[in-house]
C-alpha cells in the first residue's frame, strides 16, 4: 500500500465534521487533540499502513471527538451500589435526602448568612447555623462542627490534653480505614498515650491507678468496627465519667458512627446514642455526620460549654472547619430528626437500612428474568437470600437480611474466574457502573440500595452487547 497524505490541522479545524467539536470543546482543546492525533498517524501514513478513508475529515473528526469526550468526562460518576454494604466508604457513604440536596443547591447558588448575624448586623459564627438545632436534639450545652470525625477527635484531644497524658483502655486503641489509629492521632495532637487494662478486659481500678499529676483527660472510644466477645470487661461511660470528674479531669467519648435515635425501633442493631453518652456524663462527645446520622461528611463535637469554648479557640479549628454547603446539608438533615415518626421515610440512609427483606426479594424476582436474558444461556441467574452490612465501621458483626441476584457462569470451575472478572468489568463499564461483590464463584448483586429500577433495566441491552 502506497503512502497517503495527511490533511492539515487547519483544514480539519475548518471542516464541517469538526464544527460541532469546536462549538462544544473550544478551539484550543480541539486543536491540541487534532495535533496529537495527526502526530500519531504520521508514521503509519508514511509507511502506507492506512487507507485514505481512515484519514478522511469525518473519520478523523470522529476519533478526535472520542478523545475529547473521554478527556472531558467527569471523574465523579454515579454508580449502582449493589455490594450489600449500605454506608460504603469507597462509594460515598450516606445518601442525602431531598431536603439536604435542596439546601445545598440554595447555598451554592446564592449568598447566605454564613458568618453574618442578621439580627445584629454584625459578624456571626458559622457554628450558630446548626448549634441550636443540635442542642435541641441532644441536650448538649454547646457544639462545634469540623470536616470529619477524625478531625473532631484530633481537635478535641489537642485542645484538652496537649502536653498531658490521655488515659484509654488498651482494648479501645482502634484503627479505622485510611490508617487512622488512635495512638497516632493522640501523638499528633500532642497527647501522651497512657493505655490501661488489657485487650479484652479493663476495670475501673485500672483507670484509677493510672491517674496522676500528668493526666489531662480520660478517653473512651466506641469500638464500632470490631467486636471483642467472650471473657471481656469494660467500664461504662457513667462510671468512667465519675472517675474522671472525681479527679477534676474531662471525659472525651468518641462514638465513631454516632446516632441520635434508638435504631432498634426500626429493627436494626443497638448503637449507643449521643444523648446517652451525654446523659451518662461524657464531657465531650464526637461522631460522624455521614454515617448513621445520614448527613454530609462532618465531625460533630458536643458537650460542656467551657470545653467547647476552648476547642473553638484552638487555631486548628479554622483549618478544620466546614464550608457553607456542608452546614446547609447538615441543618436540613438534623431538621428531619424533629419528627422521628416519619424519619425512616424521609432520611434516605435510615430508609435503606430498614428496608424489609421481603420487599427486596420481590424486586429481585422482578429483575431476574430480564438480567438472565441479557446475560444469555452461559449464566445462571438465581434469586437468593443475602446478608448485607451497615458499613463504615458501624456494627461489624451485625448483618442485614436482604436478597440478591446471584450470577454464576455455567462453566467448569477452572474457567469461572475469568468469566466473572469479564462480567464484573462489563458491569463497571456501563454508563451507570454497577458495583457488586464476588463470593463463592459468583457475582452477587444485593438489591437493598437499588432505587432506580428503570435506569438499571435500561442498561441491560448495552450489557448484552458488551458480553457478546
UniProtKB/Swiss-Prot annotation:
It catalyses: L-seryl-tRNA(Sec) + selenophosphate + H(+) = L-selenocysteinyl-tRNA(Sec) + phosphate. Pathway: Aminoacyl-tRNA biosynthesis; selenocysteinyl-tRNA(Sec) biosynthesis; selenocysteinyl-tRNA(Sec) from L-seryl-tRNA(Sec) (bacterial route): step 1/1. It holds the Pfam family SelA. One of its GO terms (molecular function) is L-seryl-tRNA(Sec) selenium transferase activity. GO terms for biological process: conversion of seryl-tRNAsec to selenocys-tRNAsec; selenocysteine incorporation. GO terms for cellular component: cytoplasm. InterPro entries: PyrdxlP-dep_Trfase, PyrdxlP-dep_Trfase_major, SelA-like, SelA_trans, SelA_trans_N_dom. Transmembrane segments: none annotated. The modification N6-(pyridoxal phosphate)lysine is found at residue 291. It comes from the Bacteria. Coiled coil: none annotated. Its cofactor is pyridoxal 5'-phosphate. Keywords: Cytoplasm, Protein biosynthesis, Pyridoxal phosphate, Selenium, Transferase. Its EC number is 2.9.1.1. It is found in: Cytoplasm. Converts seryl-tRNA(Sec) to selenocysteinyl-tRNA(Sec) required for selenoprotein biosynthesis. Belongs to the SelA family. This is L-seryl-tRNA(Sec) selenium transferase. It comes from Pseudomonas aeruginosa (strain LESB58). The lineage of its organism: Bacteria, Pseudomonadati, Pseudomonadota, Gammaproteobacteria, Pseudomonadales.
Amino acid at each position: 500500500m502506497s503512502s497517503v497524505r495527511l490533511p492539515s490541522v487547519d483544514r480539519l479545524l475548518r471542516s464541517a465534521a469538526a464544527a460541532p467539536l469546536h462549538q462544544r470543546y473550544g478551539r484550543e482543546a480541539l486543536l491540541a487533540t487534532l495535533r496529537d492525533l495527526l502526530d500519531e498517524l504520521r508514521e503509519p501514513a508514511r509507511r502506507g499502513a492506512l487507507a485514505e478513508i481512515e484519514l478522511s475529515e469525518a473519520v478523523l473528526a470522529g476519533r478526535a471527538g472520542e478523545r475529547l469526550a473521554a478527556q472531558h468526562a467527569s471523574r465523579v460518576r454515579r454508580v449502582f451500589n449493589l455490594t450489600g454494604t449500605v454506608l460504603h466508604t469507597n462509594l460515598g457513604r450516606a445518601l442525602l435526602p431531598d431536603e439536604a440536596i435542596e439546601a445545598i443547591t440554595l447555598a451554592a447558588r446564592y449568598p447566605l448568612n454564613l458568618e453574618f448575624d442578621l439580627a445584629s448586623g454584625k459578624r456571626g459564627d458559622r457554628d450558630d447555623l446548626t448549634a441550636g438545632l443540635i442542642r435541641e436534639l441532644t441536650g448538649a450545652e454547646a457544639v462545634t462542627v469540623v470536616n470529619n470525625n477524625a478531625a473532631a477527635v484530633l481537635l478535641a484531644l489537642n485542645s484538652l490534653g496537649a502536653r498531658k497524658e490521655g488515659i484509654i483502655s488498651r482494648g479501645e486503641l482502634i484503627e479505622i480505614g485510611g490508617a487512622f489509629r488512635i495512638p497516632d492521632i493522640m501523638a499528633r495532637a500532642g497527647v501522651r498515650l497512657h493505655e490501661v487494662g488489657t485487650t479484652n478486659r479493663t476495670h475501673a481500678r485500672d483507670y484509677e491507678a493510672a491517674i496522676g499529676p500528668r493526666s489531662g483527660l480520660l478517653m473512651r472510644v466506641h469500638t464500632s468496627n470490631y467486636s471483642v466477645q467472650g471473657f471481656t470487661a469494660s467500664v461504662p461511660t457513667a462510671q468512667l465519667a465519675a472517675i474522671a470528674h472525681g479527679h477534676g479531669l474531662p471525659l472525651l467519648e468518641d462514638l465513631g458512627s454516632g446516632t441520635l435515635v434508638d435504631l432498634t425501633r426500626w429493627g436494626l442493631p443497638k448503637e449507643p446514642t449521643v444523648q446517652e453518652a451525654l446523659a451518662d456524663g461524657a464531657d465531650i462527645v464526637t461522631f460522624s455526620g455521614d454515617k448513621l446520622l445520614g448527613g454530609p461528611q462532618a465531625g460533630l463535637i458536643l458537650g460542656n460549654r467551657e470545653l467547647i469554648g476552648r476547642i473553638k479557640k484552638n487555631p486548628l479549628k479554622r483549618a478544620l472547619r466546614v464550608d457553607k454547603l456542608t452546614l446547609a446539608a447538615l441543618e436540613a438533615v438534623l431538621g428531619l430528626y424533629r419528627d422521628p415518626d416519619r424519619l425512616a421515610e424521609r432520611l434516605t440512609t435510615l430508609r435503606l437500612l430498614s428496608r424489609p427483606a421481603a420487599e427486596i426479594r420481590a424486586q429481585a424476582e422482578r429483575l431476574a428474568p430480564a438480567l438472565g436474558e441479557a446475560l444469555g444461556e452461559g449464566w445462571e441467574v438465581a434469586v437468593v437470600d443475602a446478608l448485607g452490612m451497615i458499613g463504615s465501621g458501624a456494627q461489624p458483626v451485625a448483618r442485614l437480611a436482604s436478597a440478591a441476584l446471584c450470577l454464576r457462569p455455567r462453566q467448569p470451575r477452572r474457567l469461572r474466574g475469568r468469566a466473572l472478572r469479564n462480567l464484573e468489568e462489563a458491569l463497571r463499564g456501563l454508563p451507570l457502573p454497577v458495583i457488586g461483590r464476588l463470593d463463592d464463584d459468583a457475582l452477587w448483586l444485593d438489591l437493598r440500595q437499588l432505587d432506580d429500577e428503570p435506569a438499571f433495566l435500561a442498561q441491560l441491552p448495552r450489557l448484552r452487547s458488551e458480553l457478546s
